């Protein structure tokens, strides 16, 4: 059924965001603006560093550049609107705008989840079968894995978005959140949302279980391989290689699991908002910091660039 047939084309929503704390609007704006600026500079900077340094043209850094791009994208989908709503009184968003925001946000979050799983598999091949690493992780395979992650992200998002377009809304629609979350739309709809809820549950469960299964299986083999190494320096190097990725995975999946384990009650809305801020705004900022601060190649490239700029003047 077409969108106009459901009388939703002119529907608007009000995003409450953090309006419960009017005295914190300006401080929150300044904090989130700083975080978003660091996110943009960090992720774009990491992509540029990987691009200009031939030493970083490896599968691991190829996946890392894609992760930085995804982090930049899904943060940019949420943060600007959230920042605007912190300083203006009119916090409305059209139904179409809400659906578009959800579509792109869902696409990039699902893509990130599978990219992290792909990166775990890459570490598994590099540590457990290093002699055949360049053969097994060919450029063609790397591109296919990334394209597959994006394609699945778009597919999941399309299914949920199409189901949202069939919903009907009436009256005053207030979303007690700072972005258009799918479950929030379902709670406001006057349509039967049974199928939508099951579709959301199925896709979320499948994505989380499948990606975590890949990650846990990969790292189980990695741990066994590392423990079999006789060289202490070899063990230390292997653990160091995986530390950044494990940190990123723990923060990302830990936050999402915590978020969806919180009971959907009025008393938990504050907790849900805080957790949502963490994985929509904070995590995209942390990822480039996590990977660059613990990575000698990245730090060396940054040092070379800075030295070149200094001596050029």
Curated annotation (Swiss-Prot):
Location(s), subcellular: Cell membrane
Cytoplasmic side: 48-55, 122-140, 219-238, 294-313
Transmembrane segments: 27-47, 56-76, 101-121, 141-161, 198-218, 239-259, 273-293
UniProtKB keywords: Cell membrane, Disulfide bond, G-protein coupled receptor, Glycoprotein, Membrane, Olfaction, Receptor, Sensory transduction, Transducer, Transmembrane, Transmembrane helix
Source organism superkingdom: Eukaryota
Any GO BP: G protein-coupled receptor signaling pathway
Sites where a glycan is attached: 7
CDD domains in the record: 7tmA_OR5D-like
Membrane topology term: Multi-pass membrane protein
PROSITE patterns: G_PROTEIN_RECEP_F1_1, G_PROTEIN_RECEP_F1_2
InterPro entries, per the entry: GPCR_Rhodpsn, GPCR_Rhodpsn_7TM, Olfact_rcpt
PANTHER family: OLFACTORY RECEPTOR
Protein name listed in UniProt: Olfactory receptor 5D18
Organism annotation: Homo sapiens (Human)
């Amino acid at each position: 059924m077409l969108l106009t047939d459901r009388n939703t084309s002119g529907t608007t929503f009000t995003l409450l965001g953090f309006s419960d704390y009017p005295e914190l609007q300006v401080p929150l704006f300044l904090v989130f603006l700083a975080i978003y600026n660091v996110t943009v500079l960090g992720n774009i900077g990491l992509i540029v560093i990987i691009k200009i340094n031939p030493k970083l043209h490896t599968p691991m850094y190829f996946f890392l550049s894609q992760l930085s791009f995804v982090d930049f994208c899904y943060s940019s989908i949420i943060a600007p609107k959230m920042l605007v709503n912190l300083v203006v009184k009119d916090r409305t968003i059209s139904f179409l705008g809400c659906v578009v925001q959800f579509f792109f946000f869902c696409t990039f979050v699902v893509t990130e989840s599978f990219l992290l799983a792909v990166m775990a598999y890459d570490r598994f091949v590099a540590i457990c079968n290093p002699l055949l690493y360049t053969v097994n992780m060919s450029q063609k395979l790397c591109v296919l894995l990334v394209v597959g992650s994006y394609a699945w992200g778009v597919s999941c998002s399309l299914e949920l978005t199409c189901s949202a377009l069939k919903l009907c809304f009436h009256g005053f629609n207030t979303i007690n959140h700072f972005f258009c979350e799918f479950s929030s739309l379902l709670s406001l709809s006057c349509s039967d949302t049974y199928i939508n809820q099951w579709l959301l549950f199925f896709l979320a469960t499948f994505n989380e279980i499948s990606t975590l299964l890949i990650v846990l299986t990969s790292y189980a083999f990695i741990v066994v391989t590392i423990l079999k190494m006789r060289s202490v320096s070899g063990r230390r190097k292997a653990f160091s290689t995986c530390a950044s990725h494990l940190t990123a995975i723990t923060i990302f999946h830990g936050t999402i699991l915590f978020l969806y384990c919180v009971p959907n009650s009025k008393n938990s809305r504050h907790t849900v908002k805080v957790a949502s801020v963490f994985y929509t705004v904070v995590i995209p900022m942390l990822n480039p910091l996590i990977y660059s601060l613990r990575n000698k190649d990245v730090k060396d490239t940054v040092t070379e660039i800075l030295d070149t700029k200094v001596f050029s003047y």
